[in-house]
């Protein structure tokens, strides 16, 4: 069981079962199957769904702020600021999606069309930290979905209910269930998922030691990883 102890009073705040092998397999399989349909969904439709996702998330702000305070020990008066940051970041990425995802013309000549095309990778595995659990995760989730990728989110064991709130908003918004999913995982299962051929990219925010483990897990595979590591960006 994944047990979260509140720093406020050292009480047991939440207790959630870790994902079983069958749940992990079903999640990977459904995400792998969904990636083609989501990739072929036009950008305007993806944007509409993600706008709804953000609105649905913010509509539950009072509950989210209370949970956030109890999970990580931040004064509740300061929790609203993170939700404002979530909204600002998400809206910026939504509003700039066409420009960011448009192909880049590198050179024109009479014989060839030279350009860089920005295509979806497939399934993105996002590993998010506890310290800014929404502001860090939105930086990975929203651009991944906008670009036509499916997302599987694994949140910190200190803030697992943040993943639950994001999933609740995604379901309410109409984003297909297999396009955005969450898993509660231990370290062993996390490494196995990273090594699975159905994961096409990893986005991790956390410690330097955690980043090293990510690199080890993808060491035998030809996939990329975005690592934001305690003031170090790779």
Give the positions of each predicted feature:
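N-terminal Rossmann-like NAD(P)+-binding subdomain of aldehyde/semialdehyde dehydrogenases
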Residues: 1-113
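Short alpha-helical
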Residues: 22, 59, 63, 74, ...
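Short loop-to-beta-strand entry elements in the cores of soluble alpha/beta enzymes
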Residues: 45, 49, 147-158, 162, ...
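Hydrophobic packing residues within well-ordered alpha-helices of enzyme cores
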Residues: 90, 163-166, 193, 214
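Conserved small-residue-rich beta-alpha loop and adjacent elements
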Residues: 105-176, 200
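Conserved NAD(P)+-binding/catalytic subdomain of aldehyde/semialdehyde dehydrogenases
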Residues: 123, 174-232
């Amino acid at each position: 069981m994944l047990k979260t102890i509140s720093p406020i009073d050292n009480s047991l705040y939440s207790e959630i079962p870790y994902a079983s092998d069958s749940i992990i397999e079903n999640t990977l399989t459904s995400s792998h199957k969904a990636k083609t349909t989501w990739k072929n969904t036009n950008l305007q439709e993806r944007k509409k769904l993600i706008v709804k996702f953000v609105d649905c998330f913010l509509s539950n702000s009072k509950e989210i702020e209370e949970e956030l305070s109890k999970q990580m020990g931040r004064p509740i008066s300061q929790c609203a600021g993170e939700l404002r940051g979530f909204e600002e970041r998400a809206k910026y990425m939504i509003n700039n999606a066409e420009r960011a995802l448009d192909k880049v013309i590198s050179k024109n000549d009479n014989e060839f069309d030279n350009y860089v095309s920005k295509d979806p990778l497939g399934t993105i595995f996002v590993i998010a930290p506890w310290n800014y659990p929404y502001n860090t995760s939105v930086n990975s989730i929203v651009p991944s979905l906008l670009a036509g990728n499916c997302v599987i989110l694994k949140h910190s064991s200190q803030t697992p209910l943040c993943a639950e709130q994001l999933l609740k908003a995604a379901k309410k918004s109409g984003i297909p269930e297999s396009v955005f999913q969450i898993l509660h995982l231990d370290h062993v299962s996390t490494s196995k998922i990273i090594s699975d051929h159905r994961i096409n990219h990893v986005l991790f925010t956390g410690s330097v030691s955690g980043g090293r483990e990510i690199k080890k897990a993808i060491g035998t595979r030809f996939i990329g990883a975005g690592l934001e590591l305690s003031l170090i960006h790779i």
